[in-house]
Amino acid sequence: MNGVEVPAKIQKRIERLREEINDHNYRYYVLSQPTIPDSVYDELFHELQKLEKKYPETITPSSPTQRVGAEPLKVFEPVHHEIPMLSLDNVFDEKGLRAFDKRIRQRLKLDKPFEYVCEPKMDGVALSLLYENGELIRAATRGDGYTGENVTQNTRTIASVPLQLRGNDYPELVEIRGEVLMPREGFAKFNREAEKRGDKTFANPRNAASGSLRQLDPRITAKRPLIFYGYLIGLLKGKDFPKNHCDVLKWFKDWGIPVISEIKVVGGIEGCLDYYEHLVKTREKMPFDIDGIVIKVNSLQVQAELGFVSRAPRWAIAYKFPAQEKMTVVKAIEFQVGRTGAVTPVARLEPVSVSGVTVSNATLHNFDELYRKDVRVGDTVIVRRAGDVIPEVVGPILAKRPKKAKLIKIPSRCPVCHAEVIKPEGEAVARCMGGLYCRAQLRESIKHFASRRALDIEGLGDKLVELFIQEKLIKDITGIYQLKKSAITALPRMGEKSAENLLTAIEKSKKTTLPRFLYALGIRGVGDTTARTLARHFHELDLLMKASIETLQEIRDIGPVVAENIHAFFHQKHNAELINKLIHLGVHWPQEKAVVKSEIAGKTFVLTGALKSLTREEAEEKIERSGGKATSSVSKNTDYVIVGENPGSKYEKAKALGISLIDEEAFLKLLKS
């Protein structure tokens, strides 16, 4: 107590800060849905620390400065941390780092520099792994630092976490603490696949790691690309601590625990500053997000002497990078059309500098995200930029929302080609149905149209497609069949022979099959198997183009979403015009024959290995034409597995399931039947 009466205004501000910080902790740690940048959170926390330092009589046991994090969720079994999982204090500039070094040396009464260990500050989820006699017996999240959540079953699915420690030089009991991360590449792939499925995407790798680790179903966690890195020992029984922290990390490596490679032992604070500058320059080359560096006293004996304050160790500090999140205002929300027809809302922003880059546009990912985040025109929002990732809007600051903030609706027409835009129920992504006609989708449409399973135009690769579009030789998909030799030979590295070969391949592609043509159209959800199913059902293109959604849904393996996609595609006037033009230019196929009764009809086949007389595509096509079904994986529903040369794992699985195995000769006899 300092004997000074606390002004009412100050008391009110302290209470308000505690409320805000506790709320943000809940959103960050429990919901994995932060609504403010880390830099803003740090400012609030430091303001509260300063006020409590000035007025110590205001400090209460429940103040955020006296504890870590938030309450654990009730759905997981609680785990008590025998040694609290404390977070680190932060500094944001060289002055703060030098002050940290000075405090340590004064406390130890040392004038000369001593060793620190510098590590990247990983931007993931803290995790405690408990091993008994080398076996993983428990994994727990940090929670509030004292009580976490038991996530053992989920953690067992992370490939980088050993279920049994390597060697035999491990202690009777050891608690290994570290960080669970989702690498940038895995995060980008996960979000791409989630968007394709119409599922929820994550705003950043940290949220993805947290959400994945805290799934109630371990099977979901198992599908997420998570990694774990160890950085500290908590409990230890049956073995003495080594001399230094870097020796602990060597133990981890020996036991099979991953340790981040960019760790350096330095002599004194100058070495720490050099390490920081190095990581500022190289951070984007790292496979995962980092938001600063961690500096620890290397000597474990010195760590013990320095001890802890209530919230953090005295022997370590986090030196954070400049904020990669800033606040700005949404001036407008516009729509971009991607290569596959995905219509993405994009925020046009008041320009703001984030990590040294001026940001004036930011993605909102999809309409589910737009509405979940509730971003409106006129909102003050948080913008994040991490590495090469496109800047994104994290969320609005609701307290700053103007009364006239405008809610955006999904556009009914494509902003590029004015075709219908549809968003199937249950999917996150709205899509343009312009298909063949939409200029935004032109490149991908042509590449797909010419691909091996479609019209199979040999020599018309990605680079040549790009060149034809760039030179305006192809303006829509029918332009492939209107290319002239003189125009092709005028292009770089395209001689007469190359032009002749390409034109020959284009001419050859005109003779195709109805399933290949349907697949080539690039209708969303219509793969080559579905294309064969449609061709076998309707026999004629005209009948398919006139089919209702109800008729389409009656077909085996075609659900409501794919039925709607097919119907919408063929009912776009421009798509129908381009299909007719392709036929007028000579694209044709033999009449699909009705399936006659055969031994193949109604049976499911899987191919493994190479056939001598047929390609895989030809074999699958013949199966479908005969009324059978060709699939890519073996299951209890498979009737026959066709075994070619050098069969793969499907052969072994079929044997284990007792499924009929036939060779190429037997398959050809079935076809003749």
Curated annotation (Swiss-Prot):
Question: Pfam families from the entry?
Answer: BRCT, DNA_ligase_aden, DNA_ligase_OB, DNA_ligase_ZBD, HHH_2, HHH_5, Nlig-Ia
- Report the residue ranges that make up the BRCT domain in this protein: 595-673
Provide the reaction this enzyme catalyses. NAD(+) + (deoxyribonucleotide)n-3'-hydroxyl + 5'-phospho-(deoxyribonucleotide)m = (deoxyribonucleotide)n+m + AMP + beta-nicotinamide D-nucleotide
Query: Which of this chain's residues are annotated to bind Zn(2+)?
Result: 414, 417, 432, 438
Any idea which UniProt keywords this protein has? DNA damage, DNA repair, DNA replication, Ligase, Magnesium, Manganese, Metal-binding, NAD, Zinc
| Signal peptide limits | none
Annotated Gene Ontology cellular components are: cytosol
Gene Ontology molecular function terms on file: DNA binding; DNA ligase (NAD+) activity; metal ion binding
Q: What is its EC number?
A: 6.5.1.2
Question: Which BP terms in the Gene Ontology apply to this protein?
Answer: DNA repair; DNA replication
What InterPro entries does UniProt report for this protein, alphabetically? BRCT_dom, BRCT_dom_sf, DisA/LigA_HHH, DNA_ligase, DNA_ligase_AS, DNA_ligase_CS, DNAligase_adenylation, DNAligase_N
Amino acids binding NAD(+): 38-42, 87-88, 119, 142, 179, 296, 320
Q: Which SMART domains does this one have? A: BRCT, HhH1, LIGANc
**Named cofactor requirement(s):** Mg(2+); Mn(2+)
Query: Is Endoplasmic reticulum one of the keywords?
Result: no
Active site, UniProt feature: 121 (n6-amp-lysine intermediate)
Which family is this sequence assigned to? Belongs to the NAD-dependent DNA ligase family. LigA subfamily.
PANTHER family cross-referenced by the UniProt entry: CHROMOSOME TRANSMISSION FIDELITY FACTOR 18, DNA LIGASE
Its biological function? DNA ligase that catalyzes the formation of phosphodiester linkages between 5'-phosphoryl and 3'-hydroxyl groups in double-stranded DNA using NAD as a coenzyme and as the energy source for the reaction. It is essential for DNA replication and repair of damaged DNA.
The name on file for this protein is DNA ligase
Species source reads Coxiella burnetii (strain CbuK_Q154)
The uppermost taxa in this organism's lineage are: Bacteria, Pseudomonadati, Pseudomonadota, Gammaproteobacteria, Legionellales
